[in-house]
Amino acid sequence: MTVSEIHIPNSLLDRDCTTLSRHVLQQLNSFGADAQDLSAIMNRIALAGKLIARRLSRAGLMADVLGFTGETNVQGESVKKMDVFANDVFISVFKQSGLVCRLASEEMEKPYYIPENCPIGRYTLLYDPIDGSSNVDINLNVGSIFAIRQQEGDDLDGSASDLLANGDKQIAAGYILYGPSTILVYSLGSGVHSFILDPSLGEFILAQENIRIPNHGPIYSTNEGNFWQWDEALRDYTRYVHRHEGYTARYSGALVGDIHRILMQGGVFLYPGTEKNPDGKLRLLYETAPLAFLVEQAGGRASDGQKRLLDLIPSKLHQRTPAIIGSAEDVKLVESFISDHKQRQGN
């Protein structure tokens, strides 16, 4: 058989030829001309993901990759060496890009402002450089989360107060999952799309377009080690799924991995508040708002148990929030346990 006799379906060729860069440009056709910088921003995010993925693939072979730095971050959490590396990668990739004016990370107390001697853009990148970094030392999946917002006002006082806005202000959001393959999932507000990094090409190639989360799914993902620290409503919900067939518990300790599973298979991710931390653990600007943006674009639902996550307005950059994210029916079910419990308390 000659090469000319080999039949390759056009659909396969189209998908194989659709890089992240090409796809983003297609998505931006419906945007104004002033939004074209978003394509370059996405390319830079992809570059950061490639650099982090390469580092992770050699984590057990290189020095200064595994373990802790001995420092704590703004949340009082011990900082892993990969946290520092990944955060520095994002800064290095964007510092002289001329695309952003600030980078806000959960690893930094205040945003990083692009120096005046560098070209300065009008967008802000908010990100969690490495989510689930405790998994790095044992070779389990981790991820990066990102969101893009446009600067509003001049921010002359360096307070970044314009970032204290609801999640609907996000122009784009996504995550990169570092697992058996490296997957980038993003949305510009018109569907959710996933790309797999082809190591031989060094390109993110379209894997799935217009992802739709099932309306109901079998997965419930939560750390049941906190069971006795939750409100009674959440304990009642957990007892409910224990008693009913068709539910499966899956929890990896990496938010991106758990959300990706639910996006693909359906179900619900829960990180409620506890007696010790009533506002939960997850950061609104860097974690839950970007993921809520994605899940809603895929037809899902995201709330703090009472309010839509994208409606929440933070009062500080590192504000935390409880999170219930996933299939619409499953999130509504959890919310119903919470509302019923409040009604009983009211009576």
Swiss-Prot record:
EC number: 3.1.3.11
Location of the protein in the cell: Cytoplasm
Positions that bind Mg(2+) 2: D128, D131, E287
Residue spans crossing the bilayer: none
Top EC class of this enzyme: hydrolase
Any one GO molecular function term: fructose 1,6-bisphosphate 1-phosphatase activity
GO BP annotation list: fructose 1,6-bisphosphate metabolic process; fructose 6-phosphate metabolic process; fructose metabolic process; gluconeogenesis; reductive pentose-phosphate cycle
Names of required cofactors: Mg(2+)
UniProt keyword annotations, A-Z: Calvin cycle, Carbohydrate metabolism, Cytoplasm, Hydrolase, Magnesium, Metal-binding
Annotated Gene3D superfamilies: 3.40.190.80, Fructose-1,6-Bisphosphatase, subunit A, domain 1
Catalytic reaction annotation: beta-D-fructose 1,6-bisphosphate + H2O = beta-D-fructose 6-phosphate + phosphate
Note describing how the cofactor binds: Binds 2 magnesium ions per subunit.
Record-listed substrate binding positions: D131, G132, S133, S134, N223, Y251, K281
HAMAP family xref list: FBPase_class1
Family affiliation: Belongs to the FBPase class 1 family.
Subunit structure: Homotetramer.
The protein, known as: Fructose-1,6-bisphosphatase class 1
Organism, scientific name: Synechocystis sp. (strain ATCC 27184 / PCC 6803 / Kazusa)
Gene designation per UniProt: fbp
